[in-house]
C-alpha cells in the first residue's frame, strides 16, 4: 500500500490518523525492546535470544488485526507480535530468562507459549480454531512461522486438517529469506510460499511484509473471512531478518552483511512508516522521540521486575512434563533434591 519512500501505491484512505500513529508507536516500541534484549543477552542477564529486527511490520500489522478474544500461536521470534497483542513485557523477558512463568499470558488473553520446535504450533492452532468453530464462537486463530517451517510435516498436516474442517485460522508466514543459514532457494522449488495453499484449496496471499498497512489489511480480511465460516488462509509476508538467527549465531558466515546494510536503508519498516507520516504532514519529531523514550522506560521497568523475580525452584524441571508426576520422574526429583540438599 505504501512504497519504500512512503508514497501511497493503492491508497490508505481506510486508515485513520490515530491507527497510523499507533502503528508507528508499536513499531518503535518493539524495536527498542528487541535491541535491549540483545544487549541483555550479551551482558549475561538473559539466555540465548532470537532477534526480530526488520520483521516489525509483519508482526505489528498482523497482531493489531486480531480481536481481543482471538488465539495467537507465536514462535520463538514473535515476541513483538505477542507484546502488541497485550502480553506482559516482564513475562516475555522471564521466558528468555528460562522461567516457565514467562509462558503465562495476561488474564483473558489466548496466547500460547512460543513454539520452539519448528512448525509444531501449526497443528495446535488448527485444533484450537476448530474447537472454537465447534463451540459456535466467532473467535479465530493466527499462527506464526518462518519459511523453514514450510518444509516440515506439521505445516502440511495443519493446513490439510484446517482445510478439511474449515477451521477459522490464519497461517501467517514471515518469509525472512533464511532458515537459520539456509537460503530460500535451497529450501524449496516453488516460486512463492503463498502458492503452497493451492494443494489444500485455500486462499494464499503474498504481501509486502515491511508495509504495516498492507499486512494489517490482508490479515484483517483473512480473519473476517475465517469468522464468517470461510475457512483458513495462508499469508506469506515477505520480509528480511537483519541480524542473527539467535545470539548464538554468526550470520556473517553464511550471508553477505552488506546486503542487510543496503536493505536497511531501503525497505526498513520503521523508516517507511516515518516517510509516509512525513509525506502526510503527520510526523512530529518530538512525538517520535517521546515514543522511543516511553518504550525505553517501559522496558527498563520490565527488566527491573524480571531481575527482582524470586529465584526459580529447581523442582520445576520435573513438575511440568506430565499432568501428574509419573513414578520415574518422582524418583529422579527426589534424588535430585537430595543431592542439592547435600551440596
Which residues are covered by each model-predicted region?
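Conserved acidic/glycine
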Residues: 1-58, 243, 250-253, 257-343
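A general secondary-structure junction signal
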Residues: 76, 237-239, 321
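Short, histidine-centered active-site or binding-site loop motifs used for metal coordination
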Residues: 5, 76, 173-176
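A generic structural signal for short coil/turn motifs at secondary-structure boundaries
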Residues: 11, 49, 82, 180-181, ...
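Cofactor-binding active-site loop characterized by glycine-rich and histidine/acidic residues
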Residues: 32-35, 39-167, 183-189, 194, ...
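Glycine-rich ThDP/TPP pyrophosphate-binding loop and its adjacent helix/strand module
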Residues: 119-308
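Short secondary-structure boundary/hinge segments and terminal tails
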Residues: 58, 83, 180, 215, ...
Amino acid at each position: 500500500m505504501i512504497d519504500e519512500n512512503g508514497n501511497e501505491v493503492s491508497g490508505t484512505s481506510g486508515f485513520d490518523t490515530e491507527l497510523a500513529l499507533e502503528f508507528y508507536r508499536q513499531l518503535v516500541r518493539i524495536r527498542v525492546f528487541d535491541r535491549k534484549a540483545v544487549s541483555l543477552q550479551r551482558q549475561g542477564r538473559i539466555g540465548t535470544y532470537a532477534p526480530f529486527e526488520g520483521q516489525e511490520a509483519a508482526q505489528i500489522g498482523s497482531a493489531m488485526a486480531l480481536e481481543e478474544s482471538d488465539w495467537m500461536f507465536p514462535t520463538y521470534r514473535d515476541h513483538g507480535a505477542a507484546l502488541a497483542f497485550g502480553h506482559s513485557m516482564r513475562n516475555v523477558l522471564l521466558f528468555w530468562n528460562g522461567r516457565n512463568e514467562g509462558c503465562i499470558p495476561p488474564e483473558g488473553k489466548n496466547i500460547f507459549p512460543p513454539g520452539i520446535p519448528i512448525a509444531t504450533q501449526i497443528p495446535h492452532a488448527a485444533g484450537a480454531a476448530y474447537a472454537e468453530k465447534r463451540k459456535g464462537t466467532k473467535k479465530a486463530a493466527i499462527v506464526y512461522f518462518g519459511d523453514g517451517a514450510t518444509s516440515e510435516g506439521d505445516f502440511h498436516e495443519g493446513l490439510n486438517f484446517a482445510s478439511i474442517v474449515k477451521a477459522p485460522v490464519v497461517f501467517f508466514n514471515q518469509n525472512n529469506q533464511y532458515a537459520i543459514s539456509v537460503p530460500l532457494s535451497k529450501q524449496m522449488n516453488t516460486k512463492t510460499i503463498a502458492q503452497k495453499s493451492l494443494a489444500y484449496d485455500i486462499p494464499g496471499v503474498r504481501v509486502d511484509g515491511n508495509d504495516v498497512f498492507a499486512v494489517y489489511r490482508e490479515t484483517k480480511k483473512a480473519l473476517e473471512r475465517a469468522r464468517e465460516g470461510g475457512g483458513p488462509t495462508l499469508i506469506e509476508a515477505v520480509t528480511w531478518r537483519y541480524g542473527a538467527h539467535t545470539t548464538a549465531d554468526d550470520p556473517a558466515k553464511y550471508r553477505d552483511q552488506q546486503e542487510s546494510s543496503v536493505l536497511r536503508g531501503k525497505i526498513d519498516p520503521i523508516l517507511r512508516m516515518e516517510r509516509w507520516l512525513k509525506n502526510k504532514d503527520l510526523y512530529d519529531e518530538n512525538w517520535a522521540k517521546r515514543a522511543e523514550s516511553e518504550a525505553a522506560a517501559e522496558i527498563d521497568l520490565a527488566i527491573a521486575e524480571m531481575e527482582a523475580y524470586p529465584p526459580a525452584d529447581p523442582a520445576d524441571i520435573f513438575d511440568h512434563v506430565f499432568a501428574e508426576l509419573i513414578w520415574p520422574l518422582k524418583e529422579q526429583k527426589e534424588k535430585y533434591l537430595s543431592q542439592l540438599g547435600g551440596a
